Amino acid sequence: MLGALLRLLSACGGVWPTSPAPPARSSSSSSAAAAADQAAAEGRDGLLWWRDLARCHAGELSVAVVQGNHVLEDQCRVESGPPPLAATCIGVFDGHAGPDAARFACDHLLPNLREAASGPEGVTADAIRDAFLATEEGFLAVVSRMWEAQPDMATVGTCCLVGVVHQRTLFVANLGDSRAVLGKKVGRAGQITAEQLSSEHNANEEDVRQELMAQHPDDPQIVALKHGVWRVKGIIQVSRSLGDAYLKHSQYNTEQIKPKFRLPEPFSRPILSANPSIIARCLQPSDCFIIFASDGLWEHLSNQQAVEIVHNHQRAGSARRLIKAALHEAARKREMRYSDLMKIDKKVRRHFHDDITVIVLFINYDQLAKGHSQGQSLSIRCALDH
């Protein structure tokens, strides 16, 4: 199936034209030329937005988002900044029950990380954890403040996937079921292979169900199978998130929230957690690129399919190309043409696919090893209307 998909992507290359990698410029390049580069690489087509290729401290990256929900619930952000935090920071935020938590996390998590890492130790797992905690506390303060006027804020949450490349170390932190996948070369032939870096906190995973049951031994209904899908308390698939105050603090489990979110019995300790899984990895010369994406992509593509699509094409437009492959597969599953899928309005598009966010980071190992950085400071956010 992958071979056919790759041939289809090559044959349809004219649908979403890609930009070649920008040539290297001297430090005297004008700001007007830089702006022209950005304009050429960034675009929008209906419910799709992209930034084909941009230089950052860790190498180059490609970003794309397609809207599937009536109101966009995915958010993303890239910050590749100057000292004191000379690092490339990536955030993918997949909201649920509304966009508010994802928007808040997008606004605050990476700035909180910059602040947490401003001390002498710099970027560490503890600094990242502190940034997640500060963002969670900030959003819960908003929920508390708006409780009487807007109680639905207590039922809004988001998955959070954060990647940080600082010097030659990669950190990946995750709440929920977005995913980071490394494409690396193995063997003498340099065959590309996928390695999943993030842990997924989804009740459909056996180890997640076991973790929940161990944490709540007195609750036989901590996970329930509904319509073939495992859910925490029969309500939500993810076991860790930012927000979702109604499953963390019992004062929000009242008649003020919608019946579908209400628990029939009180609870004495949080059901969901905001404690991220964090890995630290020393990057190697064989590590080529990392795909950061919300679960909307992984519903339709395997890890290996995704890394092969990136590896077998030029860098520019990689994120768009992955989204296009996922949408082709979504259309195939519904026995419809891709062109017809793309005509469907956002009011009903969610019946066919979720919001999908993809960020592909191409690692420049030599640059990192020398302690050099290329490009100016970079800040990217999705420009899709909500």
From Swiss-Prot:
Molecular function as annotated in GO: metal ion binding; protein serine/threonine phosphatase activity
Known EC number: 3.1.3.16
Any one Gene Ontology BP term: regulation of intracellular signal transduction
Record's keyword terms, sorted: Hydrolase, Magnesium, Manganese, Metal-binding, Protein phosphatase
Residues reported to bind Mn(2+) 2: 94, 295, 354
Record domain PPM-type phosphatase: where: 60-363
Broad EC category: hydrolase
Residues annotated to bind Mn(2+) 1: 94-95
Cofactor: how bound: Binds 2 magnesium or manganese ions per subunit.
Cofactor entry: Mg(2+); Mn(2+)
Pfam family of the protein (one): PP2C
PROSITE patterns assigned to the protein according to its UniProt record, in alphabetical order: PPM_2
Record-linked SMART domains: PP2Cc
Catalytic reaction equation(s): O-phospho-L-seryl-[protein] + H2O = L-seryl-[protein] + phosphate; O-phospho-L-threonyl-[protein] + H2O = L-threonyl-[protein] + phosphate
Recorded family membership: Belongs to the PP2C family.
Name of protein: Probable protein phosphatase 2C 36
Organism: Oryza sativa subsp. japonica (Rice)
